[in-house]
Design a protein with these regions (language model features):
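Membrane-proximal intracellular helices of multi-pass ion channels
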Residues: 1-480
């Protein structure tokens, strides 16, 4: 373990967070709000970051798999601990556990909130809250790789540790170039959404906040009814961009190269769109009698399916009041998530596809014991290492969900439905759940212990368990 490289990178990341805090600082100044919470946090981040990068300056700057996992895990914890300081100092969330929960929810792009009166919060705080979505969406380590010259091109392990999904690789031979391409696509899509929303007469501040939330598939809103008070045009724009940010970013690179044949042959993309279409059709038919308008039912179901499938978490209606069939479909969509290599959370469409292909192979093998089954995805044979990883991930995934659910069951004021949906929603980085944590509710009623457990659930889900597991494992730090 190259410990110096680990802490050196943490120092650089903390310094980068100081730079990120300049945006909410400027917003606070523009709206004539006190800048002190951000100035103090920037000072703390700079001192800590510079100290770490100077004390632990490494001779060998190569990052291997072990270092990659540890850097990613510790970086996200450090970002959240420092990022919660403005919430505490501003008085928006004076309780540390509330502030930590909100910050983790932001960086992990979950969107679960403990704020009860979001419309009364300072603009600077709201901007920081949503900007954490944008930073966490593509991954702050990917951002660091894109801008810091000292990070070597053998750092693909950071990409693999931080980018969601079972298969992550390079778009181009150099990892640094891959990171830059990803962020250029990310910035372009975000800016495009801002322009479209402003054209729909959404105020610039609102457009920025909601574009950050859409891009990171996070879902923090600045209105009590989330997106419900905005025009139909703005809701449609956000629906489209939620779906776009749930697509594998490799496909956008193929589009830039005009390789449309490979783009439209993507099995994961068609499966993703198929799930969206089927779920939308079923929910539209199910809620039609509530609104007595096919157009209204289609608009609401389209938005909510896109929001839950991509794990964004915005809402235009209280879907917890919908019939049980619609609520059940949305609950199941919480597990699926978007495509691998997107900013969405959840299991990922490709991983679900591989699971069903593995099940089909085993069933065939039971009928034909001598057969040799080959699992293919996107027309290519999937190697055994990837298949083993998928097979191992599912039982671990459900074991963590079961454990977190049992801990939440100790809460006296929450029922099984609320606790289960809170667990699934936080672990899959969605935000709203059902019952007492539904789209018009918040997580503020949970105890400090439960909020901390749910914060860890969000981190585990965003990093897909293994980086945090490895970072806290004693064997990772042993010299053997």
């Amino acid at each position: 373990m190259n410990r110096k490289m680990v802490f050196y990178m943490i120092g650089k990341i903390v310094q980068a967070e100081a730079a990120m805090l300049l945006l909410p600082l400027v917003v606070a100044l523009l709206y004539k709000e006190t800048p002190l919470p951000f100035l103090i946090t920037i000072g703390i981040a700079l001192v800590l970051g510079i100290a770490l990068s100077l004390i632990f300056k490494p001779k060998d700057r190569v990052i291997y798999a072990k270092e990659g996992f540890v850097i990613v895990a510790f970086a996200w914890i450090a970002l959240s601990l420092i990022g919660c300081i403005p919430f505490v100092l501003s008085g928006a969330l004076p309780n540390f556990f509330d502030a930590f929960f909100e910050t983790v929810s932001g960086f992990t792009t979950t969107g679960a909130s403990v704020m009860t009166d979001v419309e009364s919060m300072p603009h600077g705080v709201l901007m920081w809250r949503s900007f954490t979505h944008w930073v966490g969406g593509m991954g702050v380590l990917v951002f660091i790789m894109a801008i810091i010259p000292s990070v070597t091109d053998r750092s693909i392990h950071i990409l693999r540790a931080e980018m969601p999904g079972p298969i992550v690789g390079k778009l181009v031979p150099r990892a640094k170039q891959t990171a830059r391409i990803l962020y250029l696509i990310y910035v372009f899509l975000t800016a495009t959404e801002v322009i479209f929303l402003v054209c729909g007469k959404m105020p610039l501040f609102d457009a920025l906040v909601h574009s950050f939330g859409t891009a990171g598939t996070g879902g923090f809103g600045i209105k009590a009814d989330s997106i419900g008070s905005y025009s139909t045009y703005c809701q449609v724009v956000i629906t489209i961009f939620m779906l776009l940010f749930g697509v594998n970013f490799n496909l956008y690179f193929l589009a830039l190269l005009r390789n449309f044949r490979s783009l439209f042959k993507s099995q994961e993309l068609w499966c993703y769109l198929g799930i969206f279409g089927v779920a939308t059709a079923l929910i539209t038919a199910n809620i039609y009698n509530l609104y007595h308008s096919l157009g209204k039912a289609l608009q609401l179901s389209t938005f909510q399916v896109a929001s839950i499938l991509t794990t964004t978490g915005f809402s235009t209606a209280d879907f917890d009041l919908w019939p049980d069939l619609s609520r059940s479909i949305l609950f199941l969509l919480m597990f699926v998530g978007g495509c691998a290599g997107s900013t969405a959370g959840g299991l990922k469409v490709s991983r679900v596809m591989l699971l069903f292909k593995l099940i089909r192979r085993e069933l065939r093998h039971m009928l034909h014991p001598r057969s040799v089954g080959v699992v293919k995805l996107e027309g290519k044979r999937v190697d055994n290492a990837t298949l083993n990883g998928v097979s191992a991930y599912f039982p671990i995934y459900f074991a963590f969900i079961a454990g977190i659910f049992l801990i939440l069951s100790l809460e006296p004021n929450f029922n099984i439905e609320s606790n289960l949906s809170a667990t699934v929603s936080c672990f899959n980085n969605i935000g709203p759940g059902l019952g007492l944590v539904g789209p018009v509710q918040s997580y503020t009623g949970y105890s400090n212990l439960s909020k901390f457990v749910l914060s860890m659930a969000m981190l585990l889900g965003r990093l897909e368990i293994f980086p945090l597991w490895f970072a806290l494992s004693p064997s990772t730090w042993s010299k053997k």
